[in-house]
Amino acid sequence: MAGRRVNVNVGVLGHIDSGKTALARALSTTASTAAFDKQPQSRERGITLDLGFSCFSVPLPARLRSSLPEFQAAPEAEPEPGEPLLQVTLVDCPGHASLIRTIIGGAQIIDLMMLVIDVTKGMQTQSAECLVIGQIACQKLVVVLNKIDLLPEGKRQAAIDKMTKKMQKTLENTKFRGAPIIPVAAKPGGPEAPETEAPQGIPELIELLTSQISIPTRDPSGPFLMSVDHCFSIKGQGTVMTGTILSGSISLGDSVEIPALKVVKKVKSMQMFHMPITSAMQGDRLGICVTQFDPKLLERGLVCAPESLHTVHAALISVEKIPYFRGPLQTKAKFHITVGHETVMGRLMFFSPAPDNFDQEPILDSFNFSQEYLFQEQYLSKDLTPAVTDNDEADKKAGQATEGHCPRQQWALVEFEKPVTCPRLCLVIGSRLDADIHTNTCRLAFHGILLHGLEDRNYADSFLPRLKVYKLKHKHGLVERAMDDYSVIGRSLFKKETNIQLFVGLKVHLSTGELGIIDSAFGQSGKFKIHIPGGLSPESKKILTPALKKRARAGRGEATRQEESAERSEPSQHVVLSLTFKRYVFDTHKRMVQSP
């Protein structure tokens, strides 16, 4: 029986200078092409500028062997026959704040996250942002307290215990509550120390990682999609693209598309950590060799089965606000949108279910176009500032929820400043990367799933009218007087210049309980006639009678003067008119619609 190798991706994330690259190097036995600060700029500055990859292998633990489905392990050329191995691929993500785009790209291919903390400094800004990304994109966490060699020997254990308690408290309100925390010294003495200095705690860390790892569910079906992080040429062979398979599978001789360039190439050969293979599937990290392709055209990006990705100009996404982000998410605001392997600016419009559907079960993998949605001036959340939530009138005008009642699911229309190529149902992260990187604030604003991409450049005309997002409009006026038992005159609902003909046929409610229908304009001053199909109640007539009596007593010769006087006469108490209607945001005819 050939040896088998199961691949699991472990992300190494944390603040700049926390020792992530040194830790990955200490853990690794095999370095992949993109590993360990290969970029000259990165080596000079001592920070990781791109995703570095390396790996180590251990015998597959017995607890994982028994549950291993046959299709989840890929045959390899070199392991000892019959000895299945667990290959841990380490994804070393940069910790520099301005490179958060790269971190987000890396987190999407990670099965378990190692959060590296400098034990002398504790939780820092980028550590917190990495933790936020981990909560979105990852299920398991191991916290590594690095640089314990810098702690005074006599106080070392006390300092480690103190930081462990701090981290446990930090994780308490996250999905990673109770995650294991382990102290190490990846490179005792720091970067300048001689290589002879042995790392501390690495065997224990490997043991901990092995105990925490579970074999991810891998699915070879579906279209092939690979996240490419490095591209280079080999003389006489061709161009090699290295990366991790996000979905599907691939075999020798298959055709792949580089969607950003609209180029299709045939797979000539494949390698996984320097070992030739004939096929690979979701979760595997490999290099694909193609011919006649300039590696300079693609440093990072996506490679896929031909025509399986779409390029979109806008998208409908589900939205969930990141609680650590300060401030509201407002309609018309611009955010950095990370989708697929790209980060572009996008303008957002938020919307929610209609108020009656606020408690409906969230649908995570599709968008229902037959349903009506309520426009929102901003994402609804319980942490809105009092200045916003106290303004009930503004809330009503926008049709927003008051008293902290929030819908279980919300969405946004994102309009990208330039088209993006991405898979369907992919992760979307919105952030404010232009915020000051030195302030101690979370720049990650929201996350969600891309539910529907709009590929037509003219989507505003061809698609958006299908999207039934409405604003709820409320107008209030007064009944000036009754004309007879079945009609009244209203005022103060419209401006003088309003074309009242547009509102004819709309229903209004009187504060006395009657239902009326706008019948016609009355004069030129914005007044209008309302028909009351059920007639005025005796109580309403009593309120509105002063004007009727005055008109009845008026003599013929004084008709005009008395009519003017009657118009000025007020009822004994105000009767308020309420007009409520929907206006659909993308209706080109701007029609007003009322519920039956």
Swiss-Prot record:
Task: Identify the stretch(es) annotated as G3.
Answer: 92-95
**The enzyme's E.C. designation:** 3.6.5.-
**For GDP, which residues are the binding ones?**
19, 21-22, 149, 187
Disease (UniProt):
Neurodevelopmental disorder with progressive spasticity and brain abnormalities: An autosomal recessive disorder with onset in infancy or early childhood, and characterized by global developmental delay with intellectual disability, poor or absent speech, progressive spasticity, ataxia, and seizures. Brain imaging primarily shows cerebral and/or cerebellar hypoplasia with delayed myelination, and progressive cerebellar atrophy in about half of patients.
Region annotation G5: residue ranges?
185-187
Sequence similarity: Belongs to the TRAFAC class translation factor GTPase superfamily. Classic translation factor GTPase family. SelB subfamily.
User: Which PROSITE patterns does the UniProt record give?
Assistant: G_TR_2 (PS51722)
Q: Which InterPro entries does the annotation name?
A: eEFSec_C (IPR049394), eEFSec_III (IPR049393), EF-Tu_GTPase (IPR050055), EFTu-like_2 (IPR004161), P-loop_NTPase (IPR027417), T_Tr_GTP-bd_dom (IPR000795), Transl_B-barrel_sf (IPR009000)
Xref: CDD domains: eSelB_III (cd04094), SelB_euk (cd01889), SelB_II (cd03696)
Q: What is the recorded name of this protein?
A: Selenocysteine-specific elongation factor
Q: Name one GO biological process term.
A: selenocysteine incorporation
For region Disordered, the annotated ranges are 548-573
Q: Which residues carry this modification: Omega-N-methylarginine?
A: 556
Resulting phenotype, residue 285 to A = Abolished ability to mediate insertion of selenocysteine
Residues annotated as binding GTP are: 19, 21-22, 149, 187
Any one GO molecular function term? GTP binding
- Domain tr-type G, first and last residues per copy: 5-217
* Underlying gene: EEFSEC
Where along this sequence does the record place binding of Mg(2+)? Answer: 21, 48, 92
Provide the cofactor list for this protein. Answer: Mg(2+); Mn(2+)
A Pfam family hit: GTP_EFTU_D2
- Briefly, what is this protein's role? Translation factor required for the incorporation of the rare amino acid selenocysteine encoded by UGA codons. Replaces the eRF1-eRF3-GTP ternary complex for the insertion of selenocysteine directed by the UGA codon. Insertion of selenocysteine at UGA codons is mediated by SECISBP2 and EEFSEC: SECISBP2 (1) specifically binds the SECIS sequence once the 80S ribosome encounters an in-frame UGA codon and (2) contacts the RPS27A/eS31 of the 40S ribosome before ribosome stalling.
